[in-house]
Amino acid sequence: MLEKKTIAELDPVLWDAMQNEVRRQEEHIELIASENYVTPAVMQAQGSQLTNKYAEGYPGKRYYGGCEYVDIVEQLAIDRAKELFGAEYANVQPHSGSQANAAVYGALLSAGDTILGMDLAHGGHLTHGAKVSFSGKIYNSVLYGITADGVIDYADVRTKALESKPKMIVAGFSAYSQVIDWAKMREIADEVDAYLFVDMAHVAGLIAAGLYPNPLPHAHVVTTTTHKTLAGPRGGLILSACGDEDIYKKLNSSVFPANQGGPLMHVIAAKAVCFKEALEPSFKVYQAQVLKNAKAMVEVFKQRGFDVVSNGTENHLFLVSFIKQGLTGKQADAALGAANITVNKNSVPNDPQKPFVTSGIRVGSPSITRRGFSETDAATLAGWMCDVLESIGKDNHEQVIAETKTKVLDICKRLPVYGIGR
């Protein structure tokens, strides 16, 4: 018999944890750059009966019967993704960004091939060749970084490309606040006859809104997550406009059957919702405010004497270095967390601390903007953060945290996420 109890009735312990998370999201300010708040429509799709359906294969070419309606769902997601980013090809099945990246490598590389990617310590991602990742174990990874000014060292990229002759150059980041010159990266890739693969996960929403350069005209393949600035469900997406049907076929085969089995149709439906939302004019307004809020926060940190890596931001995130202050990212993370402000500790260039400690934090504006924060609100918040950070190690530290927490709760009440659970 089909059990029809609610979670609260069936599993009170789990329900209590879920409700506490709802309250945490309502009563804490979220500044983790890779997080965002999805709409009720996205959640409705993810909680639908589509979760019941197995659909190995692709629309019109399934290994299971009864897929006539999920075919419509997936094709909607594919078509909307193409329209949103100007792509010729889209695969909406990857379960995550890392899975999407693994599929790209599997499609175009062989084990032992050389890839040239951005150093994790300089703002890259684990899957761009870090030695602790599959990308640095299966493939021979060479890493490039940023200059003392905090911008990508294209001369270094070119030199290392000429020396290592990679089969693929990986562009993209998890903690880089400036604009990447996609055309320059393609020029370097062409010089060594390499594929250019772009991971635009962090800036996909800005790109969709036309506020950050689109890599599709330059890259052979592009991947992204569907959350972060895109504000959709957790998942991955592969795109291309290279015009090479052979590459498209290899990418499809690398996702299924090589890396994954059945797609998550409820998540694909949520992706379709997310892409439709991103095609609305209001999405561009939102993304423009994301940029304004990030820049407003940067100015406050600089005015208060903190070092901002790259001296600013041209997207939704920025890094604050505490090397000068002698603080660690772990200390800052904990202190801000006690005041209901959630950030993540992050390594910064020339960081003397270990990765689990770090000397900096990463700050992102997508979630606060989703709540309705203006530039004034964002600047005020940055000031509160500076108050907390400056009080670390001082006698008034606990008092500052308590006062800041009260202010945070007040603004969260004024600008709720969903307005439930408090």
UniProtKB/Swiss-Prot annotation:
<keyword id="KW-0554">One-carbon metabolism</keyword>
<dbReference type="GO" id="GO:0004372">
    <property type="term" value="F:glycine hydroxymethyltransferase activity"/>
</dbReference>
<dbReference type="InterPro" id="IPR015421">
    <property type="entry name" value="PyrdxlP-dep_Trfase_major"/>
</dbReference>
<keyword id="KW-0028">Amino-acid biosynthesis</keyword>
<dbReference type="InterPro" id="IPR039429">
    <property type="entry name" value="SHMT-like_dom"/>
</dbReference>
<dbReference type="GO" id="GO:0030170">
    <property type="term" value="F:pyridoxal phosphate binding"/>
</dbReference>
<keyword id="KW-0663">Pyridoxal phosphate</keyword>
<feature type="site" description="Plays an important role in substrate specificity">
    <location>
        <position position="227"/>
    </location>
</feature>
<comment type="pathway">
    <text>Amino-acid biosynthesis; glycine biosynthesis; glycine from L-serine: step 1/1.</text>
</comment>
<dbReference type="InterPro" id="IPR015422">
    <property type="entry name" value="PyrdxlP-dep_Trfase_small"/>
</dbReference>
<dbReference type="GO" id="GO:0019264">
    <property type="term" value="P:glycine biosynthetic process from serine"/>
</dbReference>
<dbReference type="InterPro" id="IPR019798">
    <property type="entry name" value="Ser_HO-MeTrfase_PLP_BS"/>
</dbReference>
<dbReference type="Pfam" id="PF00464">
    <property type="entry name" value="SHMT"/>
</dbReference>
<feature type="modified residue" description="N6-(pyridoxal phosphate)lysine">
    <location>
        <position position="228"/>
    </location>
</feature>
<feature type="binding site">
    <location>
        <position position="120"/>
    </location>
    <ligand>
        <name>(6S)-5,6,7,8-tetrahydrofolate</name>
    </ligand>
</feature>
<dbReference type="InterPro" id="IPR049943">
    <property type="entry name" value="Ser_HO-MeTrfase-like"/>
</dbReference>
<protein>
    <recommendedName>
        <fullName>Serine hydroxymethyltransferase</fullName>
        <ecNumber>2.1.2.1</ecNumber>
    </recommendedName>
</protein>
<comment type="pathway">
    <text>One-carbon metabolism; tetrahydrofolate interconversion.</text>
</comment>
<dbReference type="GO" id="GO:0035999">
    <property type="term" value="P:tetrahydrofolate interconversion"/>
</dbReference>
<feature type="binding site">
    <location>
        <begin position="124"/>
        <end position="126"/>
    </location>
    <ligand>
        <name>(6S)-5,6,7,8-tetrahydrofolate</name>
    </ligand>
</feature>
<keyword id="KW-0808">Transferase</keyword>
<dbReference type="InterPro" id="IPR015424">
    <property type="entry name" value="PyrdxlP-dep_Trfase"/>
</dbReference>
<dbReference type="InterPro" id="IPR001085">
    <property type="entry name" value="Ser_HO-MeTrfase"/>
</dbReference>
<comment type="function">
    <text>Catalyzes the reversible interconversion of serine and glycine with tetrahydrofolate (THF) serving as the one-carbon carrier. This reaction serves as the major source of one-carbon groups required for the biosynthesis of purines, thymidylate, methionine, and other important biomolecules. Also exhibits THF-independent aldolase activity toward beta-hydroxyamino acids, producing glycine and aldehydes, via a retro-aldol mechanism.</text>
</comment>
<comment type="similarity">
    <text>Belongs to the SHMT family.</text>
</comment>
<comment type="subunit">
    <text>Homodimer.</text>
</comment>
<keyword id="KW-0963">Cytoplasm</keyword>
<dbReference type="GO" id="GO:0005829">
    <property type="term" value="C:cytosol"/>
</dbReference>
